[in-house]
């Protein structure tokens, strides 16, 4: 579960390393596949994103376990997001780490195709 003020890792190559959630869209908390508004807290120099910029992001990994329809629970070691634009396309060209299958059901197919592993 991601709520306002939660700090998350960035799982793409946009140059942002850590972001903070400042708004959850359509609910009070976000889980896998939900879109949130984030502000960049830590970024690499000379990259496409800078500190204090605001972006939309989709949650791809959460520490809180999520129950699937078959009864299985899925959880990860960290909370992570991928930065997206207004058309839900990823801003980066690579995605790092495993991605949950719930993103396929939420129609983030470009992120799923960039991911090295879908769990």
From Swiss-Prot:
One of its GO terms (cellular component) is cytosolic large ribosomal subunit. It is found in: Plastid, Chloroplast. Its main location: plastid. SUPFAM superfamilies: Ribosomal protein L14. Pfam families: Ribosomal_L14. GO terms for molecular function: large ribosomal subunit rRNA binding; structural constituent of ribosome. The keyword rRNA-binding applies. It comes from the Eukaryota. Keywords: Chloroplast, Plastid, Ribonucleoprotein, Ribosomal protein, RNA-binding, rRNA-binding. Part of the 50S ribosomal subunit. HAMAP family: Ribosomal_uL14 (MF_01367). This is Large ribosomal subunit protein uL14c. The gene is rpl14.
């Amino acid at each position: 579960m991601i709520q306002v003020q939660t700090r998350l890792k960035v799982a793409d190559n946009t140059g942002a390393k850590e972001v903070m959630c400042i708004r959850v869209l359509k609910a009070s908390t976000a889980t896998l596949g939900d879109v949130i508004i984030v502000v960049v807290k830590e970024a690499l120099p000379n990259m496409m994103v800078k500190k204090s910029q605001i972006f939309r992001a989709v949650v791809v990994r959460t520490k809180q376990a999520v129950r699937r329809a078959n009864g299985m629970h899925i959880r990860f070691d960290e909370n992570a997001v991928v930065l997206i634009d207004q058309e839900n396309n990823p801003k980066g060209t690579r995605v790092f780490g495993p991605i949950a299958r719930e993103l396929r059901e939420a129609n983030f197919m470009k992120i799923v195709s960039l991911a090295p592993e879908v769990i």
